[in-house]
Amino acid sequence: MTHSVSPIGYIRSCFMEKFAIPRQPLLAPAARGTLELLPPFDQVEALEGLEQVSHVWLLFLFHQALEDKPRLKVRPPRLGGNRSLGVFATRATHRPNGIGQSVVRLEGFEAGRLWLSGIDLLDGTPVLDIKPYVPYADAVADARNGIADAPPPGIAVEWSEQARRQAHEHGQRLRQPVAELIEQCLAQDPRPAYQKPEPGRRYGVRLWDLDVHWHYPRPDLIRVLDVAGGD
């Protein structure tokens, strides 16, 4: 038996590429985006009652990781990319039907549009459904997960004077918390866990319309070098 599903809308996100997206939602509160709804769900009637809700679940498609051949085992980044687990024991992007889910903060809404924060979604992500977060049912007090029982340790982030100034200027232009977004995302250490950084190597990612570059002066430290773009 097969079923077809259609997106109810698409995400417009601060994340223009997969690299440096937090591996779980809400780890970067400054990560903002909007969900633009498609007809007929762009009518305000579909959103009545959401003013009483602080967070929502988004069900979406990993549209850049869809595969014809299903994977039974995957290598989750949490385990360094060197150890494999059954696909259903992980939140890896390579899913049987390419479906993901994230809980995000609902900042506001109007007909056809939801404003969100704490997102971990790529720009252009197709969204399949929205469900309200229900604290008494969704927060399981005695839940356990021996694979990921706590947030991964963060990494220290420092700035060059130029990068700090650029982030402030672009934040004012975009009316977005650019410096906070960069710091919160880089503190998750986006490089592959198996990769030992070399001090001379520059890393980069595109956030909003900005190209952010950094390096690792030490394995336990990121230094933001420049924040360019917006031309």
Curated annotation (Swiss-Prot):
UniProt KW keywords: Methyltransferase, S-adenosyl-L-methionine, Transferase
EC number, UniProt record: 2.1.1.-
Gene Ontology terms describing biological process: methylation
UniProt cross-references to InterPro entries, sorted A to Z: TrmO-like_N, TrmO_C, UPF0066_cons_site, YaeB-like, YaeB-like_sf, YaeB_N_sf
Broad EC category: transferase
A matching Pfam family: TrmO_C
PROSITE patterns: TSAA_1 (PS01318), TSAA_2 (PS51668)
Domain of life of the organism encoding this protein: Bacteria
Keyword S-adenosyl-L-methionine: yes
Domain TsaA-like: 5-142
Record GO terms (molecular function): tRNA (L-threonylcarbamoyladenosine(37)-C2) methyltransferase activity
Binding site for S-adenosyl-L-methionine: P22, R23, Q24, H63, Q64, R91, L122, D123, G124, T125
Family: Belongs to the tRNA methyltransferase O family.
Record's protein name: Putative S-adenosylmethionine-dependent methyltransferase RcsF
Source organism: Pseudomonas aeruginosa (strain ATCC 15692 / DSM 22644 / CIP 104116 / JCM 14847 / LMG 12228 / 1C / PRS 101 / PAO1)
Encoding gene, per UniProt annotation: rcsF
